Structures are given as C-alpha cells and as structure tokens.
Regions:
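Short, small-residue-biased leader/transition segments that mark boundaries at the very start
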Residues: 1-9, 376-380
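Hydrophobic helix-and-loop "lid/oligomerization" segment in the mid-to-C-terminal part
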Residues: 11-232, 254, 295-297
Length: 383
C-alpha cells in the first residue's frame, strides 16, 4: 500500500499521528497483508478512529451503527471502506474527501448519510447484477463452461469486479464479467486458486485491446464481436479438472463449539487486527444439529441459526455463505421442505460446519461466542 510505505519512508521515527486513520483504512482496503509495519499502522489507526479524532469517520461509524469499542479491521474493509469507495464508483470521489475533511458534526453527518445511501445503491445494483449473471449462465447454457465469460452490457463497469467475485464464490469457476463501455467492452475477472488468470489471458491476448492483472484477478478491454470467440478460446485452452471446482478450506484444528467461551474469545482478541496475512483462526465440527433460524440483512443474504452440539449444548451460528445453496443442499439431503422447516423452527438437520469465534453485538446485546460459518458440507477440509 503506497500510503503506508510513504509514511514509513518519510518519517520512520515520528510518524504523523493524524494520518494514521487514513493509513489504516488504505492498508486494509487495499488488501495488504497485516504483518510487520502494516499491522502496527492498522492497530494504531484503529485506536485513533475509535477515539473520534476525525469527524467524518466518526459520523460514518454512527450512520452504520458501529460502536467505537467494537471497531475492527473488518469494519474498515467491509463497511467504512465500501461507503467511501461507492461514491467514486457511482458519483465522484470528491464526496468522500469532503466527508474526511468535515470540521463540524452537522456537515459530517450529512455527508456520511449520503455516502451510506450511495453504498446501499451500489449493493442493490450488485444484487441485480448477480441475478442477471445467473440468468445469463442459464440462457447461454454455461453450466459446462470451465471459464465463465458473462456479458452484461447494462451493468455499470465500476461494479463488474464485485459481481465477478460474487459469481466466482457461488460457482467456484473463473469468471469474467463484461460490460459495455464508451469505447467498446470492458471487463473484470476473478479466478480460483487453480487457475492463473493473467497467464490464461496471455494465451489468447489477440482478443484484447488492453488487459492486465495477476493470478486471481484481471481487467480488460475488447471488441464486442470478440466476446464469443474469447469464451470459446479460453475454454478450449483451459486444463482445469472437476476436482479444481470443488471448494476447499484449510482449518487450523477440529474443535467442539462448546470450547469457544469468553476466555478463548478474549485470547483471540489479542491477535487482532485480523485480515489478509493474519486470518482469524478457522475451526470445524461435525454433527451439529440445525434446529431453527431466520434470515437477516436488507437483502436477506445472511442468517442466524440455533444449533445443538454433539455435547448437548446450544450455540448461535451466524451464516454468511450462500443461503440459496444451503437451502438446496438441505432439500436434497433431507427432503423437499427441509429448508422451510428449518426457518419455521422445526429443523433437525445434522451438518458439518467450518466456523470462526468472535464476540458479536446484536440488538444491543453482546454474545460470546458467536460462530460464523463459512461452508457447510459437502466441503473438503484439511488441518
């Protein structure tokens, strides 16, 4: 991250404290590894944001219902950062700058609400784009394609990468989302671990007017008439096997959820900030019986479940994965209507779960621990 590097180069001993908030934001939002100097910058930057030195960031936290003492690197990367980024994607980045330069609470709150509204618009556009991508896959019979090339001319080019990432997560295939720009077609790609996207693009570079990227992500410009030839060429040269399309997750240890108590959650807190390069520990347990649940969020994209452990305890699990895929899996494994039964509080469905442990505040109540599931079986897990 250039911001963090510049701070360290300019003044290695006496870093300007008033810039730490922005260095922390930049480091996390630029997906830098939270190690060494980066870790220190983010940790100290979080402290300053919590103290409310910057009126704009304080207001942005308030409109997003983030309590200062609960602020973490997660909020920088997935709540505050997207709000600041949305205005650059859909309007002008000057509005984010105006927020950060606000001197009065009134000005800051006005700007923060506007940015939050823009981010909600960005989220809605993203959901619509994902739905349209699903329809495109069905309409163009792409279920057998190893590399998915999806043309959505009506999608705003600034959110093509976000949509590509979401579609990649859902199907676990390399994905290109293409949109219609002023000077031809533009697009973003997101890949899986087994597919080097930039190298694959280099093999068919004659179809691009411009391209760049790395193993897991890329950007491109091309002619509209070359979309189908590109799709055919990428799939013809692709050497991925069926095993490559099976999601895999590496856990730290298999551990009963009952072991996750206040003390353990407190010890994990000492390891923060978590993020790229310093991930939150992952655990797994088999035989968790899902009894009841309900969907949450403006777009109902996550859910809370009550589960019973093999040891006889009851735990709360918050699921941030693909609810549609989870519902289909339940209906296939336990019979049609199983998903409906679970949300009606009549579930009795054993599942294996990969989870994380952390504290969570919900409706003013702090719960310890809350276990966040990433994937439900069938999933390949390794320690």
């Amino acid at each position: 991250c250039l911001v963090g590097s510049e701070m360290c180069i300019r003044d290695s001993v006496n870093i300007q404290e008033e810039l730490l908030e922005f260095a922390a934001l930049s480091t996390v939002c630029d997906v830098m590894e939270l190690k060494d100097e980066n870790r220190i910058l983010v940790k100290e930057g979080l402290k300053r944001i919590q103290k409310g030195y910057n009126e704009g960031l304080k207001a942005l936290m308030e409109v997003n219902d983030i309590a200062p003492d609960r602020l973490s690197a997660y909020h920088l990367g997935f709540v505050l950062g997207p709000c600041l980024n949305a205005t650059g994607r859909l309007d002008t980045a000057k509005r984010a700058l105006e927020l950060l330069q606000s001197f009065t609470r009134a000005d800051a709150m006005t700007a923060a609400r506007e940015l939050k509204d823009l981010n909600e618009s960005r989220k809605n556009l993203t959901v619509q784009g994902i739905q349209r991508a699903d329809e495109y896959i069905q309409e163009h019979h792409m279920a057998e394609d190893k590399v998915m090339v999806i043309y959505l001319p009506e999608v705003h080019e600034s959110i093509a990468g976000i949509i590509a990432g979401k579609v990649r997560e859902k199907y676990h295939h390399p994905v290109f989302i293409l949109t219609k720009g002023e000077d031809g077609v533009k697009g973003s790609g997101r890949s899986i671990e087994a597919y080097h996207m930039y190298d694959a693009m280099t093999q068919v570079k004659e179809y691009f007017t411009k391209y760049g990227g790395h193993k897991l992500a890329a950007g491109l410009s091309m002619r509209e008439e070359d979309i189908e030839p590109l799709r055919a060429a990428l799939n013809k040269k692709c050497t991925l096997t069926e095993d490559d399309f099976i999601p895999k997750v590496h856990i730290d240890v298999a551990m009963p959820m009952g072991y996750a108590d206040d003390a353990l959650a407190g010890e994990f807190a000492l390891l923060e900030p978590f993020g790229t390069g310093n991930p939150r520990p992952l655990f797994a347990q088999k035989g968790l019986v899902f009894q009841a649940g309900f969907k949450m969020g403006a777009n109902k994209t996550c859910a809370r479940f009550r589960v019973k452990t093999p040891e006889g305890t009851t735990q709360t699990v918050v699921f941030f994965g693909d609810l549609e895929k989870l519902g289909a899996f339940l209906d296939e494994k336990y019979g049609v209507g199983s998903e409906e039964a679970l949300y009606a509080g009549k579930g009795n469905f054993p599942l294996s779960v990969v989870y994380q442990v952390s504290q969570n505040t919900y409706k003013g109540k702090t719960e310890v621990p809350v276990s966040y599931t990433h994937l439900t079986l069938p999933t390949i897990c390794s320690v």
